[in-house]
């Protein structure tokens, strides 16, 4: 009797196993996996060289349109070191590496994590290499009327920075700041090009 029960249990399990393996549903053909969408291409903008082009003659120019010695914001600085010239000084800041070039007229801020240029600062020492007469005059004179003629009205009040003894005139929607540094009783004028920020 025990043998019959065991035999019946084994046959039942075999039948259930085969029934589970048999495809009661029609077989579906394997479909290839959908390809991921390509990342959106960055918007193409014309680029104007600070040392060759009359930048202010182009309507709507921003920091994204400006290159300095062939280097643009977002370029990997290791790839373009020779265009910038010899490194005269370096500093390590909290988020950036700062390198100084061109007779201390060009400051390049490189983001530590990506190695990409995220800010350029051009001061009056570099003005002799600037082609645009209006920008050259702004850097050499620091005249507020010239600043407003070239860049328009500021976006808010000037920012006082006690840490580096400077006053910054803000044009963040264009990625530009005009800065006046007080250094040893003298005023040094500079233009900072950085990533554009949204203003409200």
Predicted features, each with a name:
Residues 1-8:
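Bacterial N-terminal signal peptides that target proteins for export
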Residues 10-15:
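Hydrophobic helical h-region of N-terminal Sec-dependent signal peptides
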Residues 22-25:
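Bacterial signal peptide processing site
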Residues 31-45:
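Intrinsically disordered, low-complexity proline-rich regions
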Residues 45-50, 55-61, 65-67, 72-121, ...:
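A cross-family detector of function-defining hotspots
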Residues 116-137:
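Intrinsically disordered, low-complexity Ser/Thr-rich linker and spacer segments
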């Amino acid at each position: 009797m025990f043998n019959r029960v065991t035999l019946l249990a084994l046959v039942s399990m075999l039948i259930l196993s085969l029934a589970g393996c048999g495809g009661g549903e029609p077989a579906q053909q394997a479909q290839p996996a959908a390809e991921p969408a390509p990342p959106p291409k960055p918007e193409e903008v014309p680029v104007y060289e600070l040392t060759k082009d009359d930048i202010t003659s182009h309507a709507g120019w921003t920091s994204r349109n400006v290159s300095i010695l062939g280097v643009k914001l977002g370029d990997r600085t290791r790839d373009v070191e020779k265009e910038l010239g010899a490194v005269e000084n370096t500093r390590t800041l909290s988020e950036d590496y700062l390198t100084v070039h061109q007779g201390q007229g060009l400051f390049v801020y490189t983001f530590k994590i990506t190695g990409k240029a995220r800010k350029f600062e051009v001061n009056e020492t570099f003005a002799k290499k600037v082609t645009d007469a209006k920008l050259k005059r702004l850097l050499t004179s620091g005249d507020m009327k010239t600043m407003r003629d070239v860049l328009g009205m500021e976006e808010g009040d000037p920012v006082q920075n006690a840490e580096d003894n400077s006053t910054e005139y803000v044009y963040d929607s264009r990625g530009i700041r005009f800065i006046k540094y007080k250094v040893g009783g003298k005023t040094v004028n500079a233009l900072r090009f950085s990533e554009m920020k949204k203003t409200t």
